[in-house]
């Protein structure tokens, strides 16, 4: 639905039967969103008309984290619950490339695919990780993989200069954005008794890197010296 911010009246409403589950992206007066059957839709923001839809493979078991959308210029990149990533050319309305994330965690094989939000830098390189066991750097234009490293998370990745910041459980990692090498890797313990530390988000400002945990704790890491923490 679209609602007017002036009078809160409904401008238009579109029902397509299957619930939408992904994040929403808006590009050139069109909305892009994925439903729980791994089908992506393009909807006109002005009148709610359906421009087109594109269906991909879908599994019975799924999670909302399976479906992530990002846009770079006129390239629409998205993941689905089948462990795939697609790039659609929004001008030609066709598949530019697609990749399959192979499950690499053999000891505890995840049944449901979960992905981080897709992050794209100014040069057109996307970064994504998943519970399938790897973090990837991929060129948006061609789909070629710059590097893949055996690190897993479903928390949002952060780009800071030539570094990628990652959190997984109680661990904070810094990866070289160009090479995929690990620059910093440290686990933290809770200051609270009988409490386990699990990071859930990162905030970055001039004063430092804030690692926010599930138990309301926050660890501050110095931007210039990662070993300097509070």
Segments from the language model and where they lie:
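WD40 beta-propeller blade core
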Residues: 1, 41, 86, 95, ...
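Short loop/turn segments that connect beta-strands within beta-propeller blades
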Residues: 4-8, 44-48, 89-93, 139-143, ...
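Extracytoplasmic beta-rich repeat domains
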Residues: 9-28, 49-73, 94-122, 144-161, ...
């Amino acid at each position: 639905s679209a609602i007017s911010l002036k009078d809160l009246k409904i401008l238009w409403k579109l029902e397509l039967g299957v619930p939408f589950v992904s994040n929403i992206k808006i590009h050139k007066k069109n909305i892009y969103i994925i439903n729980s059957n791994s089908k992506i839709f393009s909807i006109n923001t002005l009148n709610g008309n359906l421009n087109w839809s594109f269906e991909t493979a879908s599994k019975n078991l799924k999670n909302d984290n399976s479906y992530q959308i990002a846009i770079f210029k006129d390239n629409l990149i998205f993941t689905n619950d089948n462990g795939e990533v697609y790039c659609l050319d929004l001008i030609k309305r066709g598949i530019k490339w697609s990749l399959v994330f192979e499950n690499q965690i053999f000891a505890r094989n995840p049944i449901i695919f979960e992905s981080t939000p897709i992050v794209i830098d100014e040069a057109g390189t996307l970064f994504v990780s998943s519970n399938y066991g790897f973090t990837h750097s991929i060129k948006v234009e061609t789909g070629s993989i710059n590097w893949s490293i055996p690190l897993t998370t479903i928390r949002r990745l952060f780009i800071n200069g030539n570094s990628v910041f990652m959190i997984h459980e109680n661990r904070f990692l810094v990866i070289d954005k160009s090479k995929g090498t690990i620059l910093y890797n440290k686990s933290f313990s809770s200051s609270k008794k009988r409490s386990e530390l699990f990071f859930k988000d990162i905030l970055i400002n001039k004063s430092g890197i804030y690692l926010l945990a599930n138990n309301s704790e926050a660890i501050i890491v110095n931007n210039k010296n990662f070993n300097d923490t509070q």
